[in-house]
Amino acid sequence: MSTISVLITALALSMDAMSLSIYQGIASTESQKKQNFLKIVLTFGIFQFAMALVGSLSGILFIHYISLYSKYVSFAIFLFLGLMMLKEALKKEEMEYDEKYLDFKTLIIMGIATSLDALLVGLTFSILPFYQTFLYTVEIGVITAIIAGLGFILGDKFGNILGQKSHFLGAALLIFISINILL
């Protein structure tokens, strides 16, 4: 696999993380932006790297089981997050960002939900020498972190421009992605 192929793969893998990052950029208050930006970038970058590496190390032993359920788990999580965001957007009063929303448990769930596909991609690396696998998985993690950061910034800008309507946009985006996962 060439470096260009890994770059394109990493960009494709990072789209789920970008979607959630956009939402976090929209939802975060001014006082939470820097902290949430770091949480998002690190969580998505580390999880994409780690899951791709775990996938490559586990080889073909578990590919059947992982491939059976990964899209359904991702669908359920994205749909749940989208519906939760839609429910909040439908409230009449101005929404307040819940600082507990990005607690450790939530970050873990989001990290897993966005990196199940990286686990499967990692399985394709299992035939490569370890040093090459490691470099490719690091590349995937770094690119995902960058894309997640850009998504957060984009969400922040949209949130400032659109106000509360941006929550409808974020909800629609998450629900669309959940449906797209099943197709």
UniProtKB/Swiss-Prot annotation:
Compartment(s): Cell inner membrane
Source taxon at top rank: Bacteria
Parts of the chain that traverse the membrane: 3-23, 43-63, 66-86, 107-127, 134-154, 161-181
Alphabetical list of Pfam families matching this protein: Mntp
Stored InterPro entries: Mntp/YtaF, Put_MntP
The keyword Cell membrane is annotated on this UniProt entry: yes
Record-given protein name: Putative manganese efflux pump MntP
Source organism: Fusobacterium nucleatum subsp. nucleatum (strain ATCC 25586 / DSM 15643 / BCRC 10681 / CIP 101130 / JCM 8532 / KCTC 2640 / LMG 13131 / VPI 4355)
